[in-house]
From Swiss-Prot:
Its cofactor is Mg(2+). Belongs to the ketol-acid reductoisomerase family. Substrate binds at residue 414. The active site is at 132. Involved in the biosynthesis of branched-chain amino acids (BCAA). Catalyzes an alkyl-migration followed by a ketol-acid reduction of (S)-2-acetolactate (S2AL) to yield (R)-2,3-dihydroxy-isovalerate. In the isomerase reaction, S2AL is rearranged via a Mg-dependent methyl migration to produce 3-hydroxy-3-methyl-2-ketobutyrate (HMKB). In the reductase reaction, this 2-ketoacid undergoes a metal-dependent reduction by NADPH to yield (R)-2,3-dihydroxy-isovalerate. SUPFAM superfamilies: 6-phosphogluconate dehydrogenase C-terminal domain-like, NAD(P)-binding Rossmann-fold domains. This is Ketol-acid reductoisomerase (NADP(+)). Residues 209-344, 345-485 form the KARI C-terminal knotted domain. Mg(2+) 2 binds at residues 217, 389, 393. Gene3D superfamilies: N-(1-d-carboxylethyl)-l-norvaline Dehydrogenase, domain 2, NAD(P)-binding Rossmann-like Domain. GO terms for cellular component: cytosol. Its EC number is 1.1.1.86. Keywords: Amino-acid biosynthesis, Branched-chain amino acid biosynthesis, Magnesium, Metal-binding, NADP, Oxidoreductase, Repeat.
Length: 492
């Protein structure tokens, strides 16, 4: 198999990278009805598998789980989760031949073996679904020509897919049909019904392509969504402790700070996040973010280049073949960091204190979001896709850190995201060491800002620059669709 994207000519590469259409609410008037009365079999019962299945069942679909025979015989976690939630469970041989839609929600590294196992069992004209297109785009999986191949990609971890659905809402979602596999022309109808069944139509759906989803998803998770949060956590914690802050207090400020800061980001973009600061702190955060963008731009560009070329995926797949030696080593090292092992502060930190004491954290968020967005758009990815893969998903990832620090983030995200996170953070931490030595009183921690005055013209220019960045323009439009957004922060 060859990397699918690299087999396309330049015109097709650009066309697929740039495919993105915001779908109107009216297009989902039938909700999940196209799949009602049909059999949907999910392969895999991890975070996405279980939670999408719960939503789809609650939306009236017939859901069952196909698991490997040994997982059933040994009553592994996947079997327990499916059976404890009242789902029908069977082997591939028992369930796949009856399925109208087979949804592959196993980890990326298992996709090739899973798809090769289920394809011979699928009935003629059935559909195969993914929630991430890595197997199709990067691995180059070849699927039978009578099989329709679709994707529904919720833009958040599986746990949040369920939580937002239970709140009566949903999460923004990308849907796509693989152009090489739509023999009956029903791919879009299947994808729309599946997206509606998960609740995604209530938060906004983009019609995209497998290529655009994969390339933008990899870029977002490696840089701002996971890599920047991990690098920022380690750098800021070490800086606070080195300057005399109690380690437990520093840990809590960082652990819950990202979530509190990005809740403002979710509700009102970078503009609202920056507006939570005093005017002197806002001007300072803006200056810090501009410095960070200059320092980090080449790193962001390298990640985008390696994703587009396939260099990233080939390196990760080589690690798969080596029993995840790099991934597991990086995971172990992260677990031993001072931030991860620090005691928990039992006192309360006020909501505004997270902003006032986290000026450089806000600068990191602003710089990372804007750089990820700008770098994706420069590579041919449409602004709406770049927004969802940089700004919108960030509060959901920050929420995982608030639960159990970096450990929880890396457990919840995919192995693909985790591998990319380590690549970025291991490069970003040394890259930003010198920058961290230039921080002033008031940039991080309890020390007061050294300046309490602001030049009116400078403040005006800063506000204009913040509010008129392209990500703020597209963000205002997309957030207008999400009128039912629910607050998720749990900071204490």
């Amino acid at each position: 198999m060859a990397n699918y994207f690299n087999t396309l000519n330049l015109r097709n590469q650009l066309a697929q990278l740039g495919k993105c259409r915001f779908m109107a609410r009216e297009e989902f008037a039938d909700e999940a009805s196209y799949l009602k009365g049909k059999k949907v079999v999910i392969v895999g019962c991890g975070a996405q598998g279980l939670n999408q299945g719960l939503n789809m069942r609650d939306s009236g679909l017939d859901i069952a789980y196909a698991l490997r025979a040994e997982a059933i015989a040994e009553k592994r976690a996947s079997w327990r989760k499916a059976t404890e939630n009242g789902f029908k469970v069977g082997t591939y041989e028992e369930l796949i031949p009856q399925a109208d839609l087979v949804v592959n929600l196993t980890p990326d590294k298992q996709h090739t073996s899973v798809v090769q196992a289920v394809q011979p069992l699928m009935k003629d004209g059935a559909a195969l679904g993914y929630s991430h297109g890595f197997n199709i785009v990067e691995v180059g999986e070849q699927v039978r020509k009578d099989v329709t191949v679709v994707m529904v990609a919720p833009k958040c971890p599986g746990t949040e897919v369920r939580e937002e659905y239970k709140r009566g809402f949903g999460v923004p979602t990308l849907i796509a049909v693989h152009p090489e596999n739509d023999p009956k022309g029903e791919g879009m109808a299947i994808a729309k019904a599946w997206a509606a069944a998960t609740g995604g139509h209530r938060a906004g759906v983009l019609e995209s392509s497998f290529v655009a989803e994969v390339k933008s998803d990899l870029m977002g998770e490696q840089t701002i969504l996971c890599g920047m949060l991990q690098a920022g956590s380690l750098l800021c914690f070490d800086k606070l402790v080195a300057e005399g802050t109690d380690a437990a207090y520093a840990e809590k400020l960082i652990q819950f700070g990202w979530e509190t800061i990005t809740e403002a980001l979710k509700q009102g973009g970078i503009t609202l996040m920056m507006d939570r600061l005093s005017n002197p702190a806002k001007v300072r955060a803006y200056a810090l973010s501009e410095q960070l963008k200059t320092i980090m731009a080449p790193l962001f560009q390298k990640h985008m280049d390696d994703i587009i070329s396939g260099e990233f995926s080939s390196g990760m797949m080589a690690d798969w073949a080596n029993d995840d030696k790099k991934l597991l080593g990086w995971r172990e090292e992260t677990g031993k960091t001072a931030f991860e092992t620090a005691a928990q502060f039992e006192g309360k930190i006020g909501e505004q204190d997270y902003f006032d004491q986290g000026v450089v954290m806000i600068a990191m968020v602003k710089a990372g979001v804007e750089l990820a967005f700008e770098t994706m758009v420069a590579a041919g990815i449409v602004e709406e896709s770049a927004y969802y893969e940089s700004l919108h998903e960030l509060p959901l990832i920050a929420n995982t850190i608030a639960r159990k620090r970096l450990y929880e983030m890396n457990v919840v995200i995919s192995d693909t995201a985790e591998y990319g996170n380590y690549l970025f953070s291991y490069a970003a931490v040394p890259l930003l060491q010198e920058f961290m030595t230039t921080l002033q009183a008031g940039d991080l921690g309890k020390q007061a800002q050294t300046s309490t005055s602001v030049d009116n013209a400078q403040l005006r220019d800063v506000n204009e620059a913040i509010r008129h960045h392209d990500i703020e323009t597209v963000g205002r439009k997309l957030r207008g669709y999400m009128t039912d957004m629910k607050r998720i922060a749990v900071a204490g």
